[in-house]
């Protein structure tokens, strides 16, 4: 009897778990091999117990026929009931997989793909929404409650930011703007193009401004609530001689911004809208005059509302800020201190003689930073501005340099060049200064007093004056007609009476011979005098007459 020889099984009783199939062909190959190994092992076990077993090829054909029948029945039952366990005891139970058209669908699907999509859309439209003020936060529970109240697909797909009404834009315009920072003080205004939007978040909330640069940008470059704006006013012709329709916006703890619109109608419209939004419309009714009124001559106005004093230098009649009053008494007695004149006016004063006045200077109050000061000087015919910081004790700081006083700073820059970005090519030392004196006791208008009057010394280059009076202080504490005790640093200044007599004599002389005098009458200024040359005094007397 030919009986088959029983062969030991070459397969392990506990094979390793097969790797995940990459496709249907791999799936069938993998499970067919596993079923063949199991069938061969069972075949040899059965052959040992039963003599004369059938041939292996016959067993495989019968197994394939029966396998097809049982496999189809198991698949139909697995769709209706819970998934059954695999017939292989060594393999872990696997969840039944639905029918798929590709191998990518064989793995388990994500738990909530729609939820991830909705979260991503919500974040996207949140950034594009121009809704809330900076610092405002939204509560997640409120968002979910609002979304849950929406029926249908809008509740599941659309984010809350898209369904809420957008913030109302009250006013919008494309314009030019410039930041009034330290760089603008040195090199002039640098204009940029942007879009200014005034928005209202709703009743009970403060309006806020947004500045977009470039104009088509969706994210604002600057955004401030209107409640933080402390001043909004039109610029004067002296401040912006080449830009007519401009206004300045002063924001608390921020750099001042100058805006330029297209015409006067837009200027007045924006000023009215901003003043109404900030509540500054009634608090500063006479801060500045409109451009059309400032350019026309008219009757004399009060010192607070007059713009004539801006054309003549300082304005002692205007009440100063408390920050300025703390430090102005260190400078108000000196003839080179011009008080609160504009940057443009200071540049005009030091540029009158062009490159010949190289090193001529004056000291003025800062326009943008109240309580600070600016040294304006002539650099080869161009005006430069250097910011000064003055402490309550009179100490002065210029960039990284510290001085005991402003006079010590001027003495230092008389001997050493002023530190500038251009280096040795822009070497400049202080050589003289522009003088400003009060025209009469108690007068709010000032004029430039040239040093060719009343006596001229060609050797020393400075006048010999008979009086030792000091000009009235620019501070609010100076009374009309009161003469401050002299502190002679550069030269001696005449009394107000002598100045008035000299000015009256100049008016008579200017009628007969305009060029014989160092003044020129300006018809547009209604009798005021303006200096045209010889308005400087050398700084060489600074060391000689100091501490007298």
UniProtKB/Swiss-Prot annotation:
The keyword NADP does not apply. Belongs to the SH2B adapter family. One of its GO terms (biological process) is negative regulation of MAPK cascade. InterPro entries: PH-like_dom_sf, Phe_ZIP, Phe_ZIP_sf, SH2, SH2_dom_sf, SH2B, SH2B3_SH2. The lineage of its organism: Eukaryota, Metazoa, Chordata, Craniata, Vertebrata. Keywords: Phosphoprotein, SH2 domain. PROSITE patterns: SH2 (PS50001). This is SH2B adapter protein 3. Residues 168-279 form the PH domain. The gene is Sh2b3. It comes from Mus musculus. Residues 1-25, 78-108, 128-160, 290-313 are annotated as: Disordered. Residues 1-11, 137-148 have a biased composition (Polar residues).
């Amino acid at each position: 009897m030919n009986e088959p020889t029983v062969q030991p099984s070459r397969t392990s009783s506990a094979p390793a778990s097969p790797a995940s199939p990459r496709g249907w062909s791999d799936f069938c190959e993998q499970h067919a091999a596993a079923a063949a190994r199991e069938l061969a092992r069972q075949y040899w076990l059965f052959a040992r117990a039963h003599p004369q077993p059938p041939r292996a090829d016959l067993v495989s054909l019968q197994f394939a026929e029966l396998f097809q029948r049982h496999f189809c029945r198991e698949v139909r039952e697995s769709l209706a009931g819970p998934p059954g366990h695999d017939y292989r005891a060594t393999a872990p139970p696997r969840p039944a997989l639905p029918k798929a058209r590709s191998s990518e669908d064989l793995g388990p699907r994500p738990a909530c793909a729609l939820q991830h999509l909705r979260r991503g859309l919500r974040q996207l439209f949140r950034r594009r929404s121009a809704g809330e003020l900076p610092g405002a936060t939204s509560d997640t529970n409120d968002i979910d409650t609002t979304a849950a109240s929406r029926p249908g697909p809008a509740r599941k797909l659309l984010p809350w930011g898209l369904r809420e009404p957008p913030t109302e834009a009250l006013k919008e315009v494309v314009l030019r703007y410039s930041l009034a920072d330290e760089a603008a003080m040195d090199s002039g205004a640098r204009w940029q193009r942007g879009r200014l939007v005034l928005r209202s978040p709703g009743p009970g909330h403060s309006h806020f401004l947004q500045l977009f640069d470039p104009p088509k940008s969706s994210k604002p470059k600057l955004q401030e609530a209107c409640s933080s704006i402390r001043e909004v006013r039109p610029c004067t012709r002296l401040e912006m001689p080449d830009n007519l329709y401009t206004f300045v916006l002063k924001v608390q703890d921020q750099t001042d911004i100058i805006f330029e619109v297209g015409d006067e109608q837009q200027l007045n419209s924006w000023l009215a809208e901003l003043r109404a939004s900030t509540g500054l419309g009634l608090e500063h009714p006479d801060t500045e005059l409109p451009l059309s009124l400032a350019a026309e001559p008219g009757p004399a106005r009060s010192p607070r509302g007059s713009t004539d004093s801006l054309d003549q230098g300082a304005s002692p009649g205007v009440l100063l800020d408390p920050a300025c009053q703390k430090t102005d008494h260190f400078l108000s007695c000196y003839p080179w201190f011009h008080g609160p004149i504009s940057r443009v006016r200071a540049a005009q004063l030091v540029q009158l003689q062009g490159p010949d006045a190289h090193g001529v200077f004056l000291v003025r109050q800062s326009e943008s930073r109240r309580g600070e000061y600016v040294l304006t000087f002539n650099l080869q015919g161009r005006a430069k501005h250097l910011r000064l910081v003055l402490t309550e004790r009179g100490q002065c700081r210029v960039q990284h340099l510290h001085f005991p006083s402003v006079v010590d700073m001027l003495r230092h820059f008389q001997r050493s060049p002023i530190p500038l970005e251009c280096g040795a090519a822009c070497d400049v030392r202080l050589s003289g200064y522009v003088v400003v004196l009060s025209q009469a006791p108690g007068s709010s208008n000032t004029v430039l007093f040239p040093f060719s009057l009343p006596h001229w010394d060609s050797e020393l280059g400075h006048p010999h004056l008979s009086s030792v009076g000091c000009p009235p202080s620019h501070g609010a504490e100076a009374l009309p007609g009161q003469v401050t005790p002299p502190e002679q640093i550069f030269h001696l200044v005449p009394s107000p009476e002598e100045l008035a007599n000299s000015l009256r004599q100049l008016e008579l002389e200017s009628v007969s011979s305009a060029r014989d005098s160092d003044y020129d009458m300006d018809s547009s200024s209604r009798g005021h005098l303006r200096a045209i040359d010889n308005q400087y005094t050398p700084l060489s007397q600074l060391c000689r007459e100091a501490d007298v």
